[in-house]
Regions:
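Auxiliary tRNA-acceptor-end handling modules of aminoacyl-tRNA synthetases
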Residues: 1-158, 176, 180, 191-277
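Zn2+-dependent metallopeptidase catalytic core
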Residues: 157-185
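Stable alpha-helical elements in mature extracytoplasmic
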Residues: 162-169, 273, 277, 281
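Active-site recognition of the HExxH zinc-binding catalytic motif
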Residues: 171-174, 231, 279-286
Length: 286
């Protein structure tokens, strides 16, 4: 629509066909399972859901597989994928080139205007956009609150007994931010109720969420969405997989059992498990 400066683009084929960058199968899987070309009749878009700053697209891709795993008698493999289309800030945050003496997460960039007759690569730091409310006080070295603090919500699926430990793990980062001049820079919140915000969703890129996933996986991860132009962290979804509890129960026994009677009991005290979770959440948030 030229009058409103909007354009309607049909991108269905990107998600329902074997498009580069949107497909599910790598060369190794193709070789191992003897995977053929995409079965377009059994590939489709499952769901599209939009929020103010992002659209989530879930789609299924199906392939014939002559050497599929033994439990698969249909000789096919289907994959369900999710892709996110995210609107970046209208004005990019000022980027910061990485100082390699400091351990930053970073994004690689390329300078094609270099006079070295080749492209030069460099890295920009991944960081939250924290701006002081009172710039003059901040310049004087006083602790000030940020205009927009970092807020992590807890997943509605998080068991009530673990929520205090998750919150403590998130807010353990208040101290380091105070060293940088910000107070209350990071806040942990319970998810809003349906009455408070009926549209709240962990998929909404406006919210950073610590997700509690019902899974047999023993792990936790801390992925984030970053603006590739500036390195600004737009949101983060820390993922805690339920069975990671067992991993830390085992580590607690092996690493402290010789000197710690609590670790040698059949049932580890709840507060001990909670403190382990707290430390993992703090690690992933960091």
């Amino acid at each position: 629509n030229s009058e409103e400066e909007f354009h309607l683009v049909d991108v269905s084929d990107f998600f329902s066909k074997d498009s580069p960058g949107f497909n599910a199968v790598g060369e190794t899987e193709k070789k191992n399972y003897k995977i053929g070309s995409l079965d377009s009749k059994r590939s489709f878009i499952d769901r599209v859901k939009s929020f103010p700053r992002n659209t989530e697209i879930t789609h299924t891709l199906t392939y014939p597989a002559a050497a599929a795993p033994r439990s698969n008698r249909s000789e096919t493999l289907s994959f369900q994928l999710n892709h996110s289309i995210i609107a970046l800030p209208e004005k990019p945050m000022k980027s910061r080139t990485v100082d390699h003496r400091v351990g930053w997460f970073s994004l690689e960039q390329y300078n094609y205007s270099s006079e070295a007759l080749k492209s030069d690569n460099y890295r920009i730091a991944s960081r939250w956009k924290l701006e002081p409310k009172d710039k003059e006080a901040y310049a004087r070295g006083e602790l000030v609150e940020p205009i927009q603090p970092i807020v992590f919500y807890l997943d509605p699926a998080t068991p009530m007994k673990w929520r205090p430990y998750f919150k403590k793990g998130i807010e353990d980062w208040k101290g380091p931010f105070e060293k940088a001049g910000f107070k209350n820079a990071i806040v942990a919140k319970d998810p809003p109720t349906k009455e408070e915000d009926p549209d709240f969703s962990p998929e909404d890129v406006r919210y950073s969420v610590v997700r509690y996933v019902a899974s047999t996986t023993r792990n936790a991860t801390g992925p984030s969405v970053k603006d590739p132009r500036s390195g600004e962290i737009i949101e983060s979804d820390v993922i805690w997989y339920h069975n990671h509890l067992r991993s830390y129960r085992n580590r607690y026994l092996l690493e402290t059992g010789a000197a710690n009677e609590k670790a040698r009991t059949l049932n580890t005290p709840e507060e001990e498990i909670g403190e382990m979770m707290r430390r993992v959440i703090a690690h992933e948030v960091g």
